[in-house]
A protein has these predicted regions:
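N-terminal membrane topogenesis motif
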Residues: 1-23, 72-80, 107-109, 141-143, ...
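Hydrophobic alpha-helical transmembrane segments
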Residues: 110-117, 143-191, 208-209, 241, ...
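Alpha-helical transmembrane segments of multi-pass membrane transport and lipid-handling proteins
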Residues: 80-105, 110-111, 155, 159-163, ...
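Interhelical loop/hinge segments that connect adjacent transmembrane helices in multipass membrane
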Residues: 4, 140, 144, 167-168, ...
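Helix-loop junctions and terminal segments of transmembrane helices
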Residues: 54-71, 134-135, 246, 250-288
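C-terminal transmembrane helix end/exit motif
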Residues: 60, 128-135, 139, 159-163, ...
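Membrane-interface junctions at transmembrane-helix termini in multi-pass inner-membrane proteins
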Residues: 4-5, 65-71, 121-147, 168, ...
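Signature of the first transmembrane helix
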Residues: 3-58, 85-99, 119, 149-154, ...
Length: 338
């Protein structure tokens, strides 16, 4: 079996497992909590992800593109910059909490956002060995670690929700997942451990590479999370919570497609660039066509069955999430086709 096929299988297994866990937790949590709680959590997640996107300087991508995997000055500098970024992002998120609570008229945000921000701090300590594993298309260990961390965080969230019946319980999952994931990555992945170091030449390479990454991630933030900010401000808390459930379910096939593209297809593109032969380009085009058709088919099926599926799986409070999910799938079809 080729390395790319093996990687695709592990990514697929990881995504199926992750989406299965997420769906199971959604079924349980929608019975423990109220729709407004999921709207508040959607805003928290959007703010946290937006901060991560607009501050993305391309450290991960630069390591993937760097031809020398043994350059410790480069790797240690990237890890140190990542640590600093995590500290800064956490501080910014904490400072934004009362502002966000006022803008969206949600007192829970003042508590939930600082809790979720701890995940940004912890993620900054992720080892560069994880990126090197992705570069080698060695996805087995990271995939198992991601699933274990997700399972642990879901258990923590369900326990907190059952005990408190508060929206704040949902925010606990972000730092718990980050702590479990980063800890396991440091323990399980083999290789040289990162240490704090700043090399001026390496910093310059990261800055040069990150200019274009930052611009693209800002655009991704606006496209991917702009709806949450608009709807969070204009819809009622209950309606926005139902929309958040619909978006989460409709996004399952879309997220799977993007995860596969980001992890495997990028290596196929790199191989085609490194070996610019007609055969390599033909293989790349064939892989891209299969990927696109598969993604479109999965999203189309999800859109068709969403109303009936949500009607069966969720209680009547979330019935409107069905047609919402179908409409979202139409938008996702255009996104993937483009």
């Amino acid at each position: 079996m080729s390395t790319i096929k093996s990687s695709a299988i592990w990514i697929a297994a990881g995504q199926f497992g992750a989406q299965g866990l997420r769906f199971a937790s959604s079924l349980i949590l929608t019975r423990l909590l109220f729709p407004e709680a999921f709207g508040a959590m959607a805003l928290v997640t959007s703010i946290v992800v937006s901060l991560a996107l607009v501050s993305d300087t391309g450290i991960r991508q630069a390591i993937l593109q760097n031809p020398d995997d043994t350059d410790r000055r480069f790797l240690d500098t990237g890890w140190t910059l990542q640590l600093v970024r995590g500290v800064v992002l956490c501080a910014v998120a904490v400072a934004l909490a009362p502002v966000a609570a006022g803008i969206f008229d949600s007192a829970e945000l003042a508590v939930m956002l600082p809790i979720a921000a701890l995940g940004l701090l912890i993620d900054g300590a992720s080892p560069t060995r994880e990126v090197l594993a992705q570069k080698r298309l060695a996805f087995r260990a990271p995939t198992v670690i991601d699933l274990a961390a997700q399972f642990g965080s879901i258990v923590a969230v369900i326990a907190a929700a059952a005990a408190t019946e508060s929206a704040v319980a949902l925010a606990i999952g972000i730092p718990v997942a980050s702590l479990l994931r980063v800890s396991l990555l440091h323990v399980v992945l083999a290789g040289v451990r990162d240490r704090p170091r700043i090399d001026r030449a390496a910093v310059g390479r990261f800055v040069t590479f990150g200019k274009w990454i930052t611009l693209s991630t800002v655009c991704a933030m606006v496209v991917g999370h702009g709806d949450k900010y608009v709807f969070g401000a204009v819809l009622t808390a209950e309606a926005f919570g139902i929309y958040a459930i619909a978006f989460a379910l409709a996004s399952i096939p879309r997220n799977f497609a993007f995860r596969l593209a980001g992890s495997v297809m990028i290596q196929s593109y790199k191989a085609a660039v490194d070996t610019p032969t007609p055969e390599a380009r033909a293989r790349l085009q064939a892989q891209r066509l299969k990927f696109t058709l598969g993604a479109l088919g999965a999203i189309g099926v999800a859109g068709l069955i969403a109303p009936a599926f949500i009607g069966l799986a969720y209680d009547p409070r979330y019935a409107l999430a069905g047609p919402m999910a179908s409409l979202l799938c139409i938008a996702f079809l255009a996104e993937v086709a483009g």
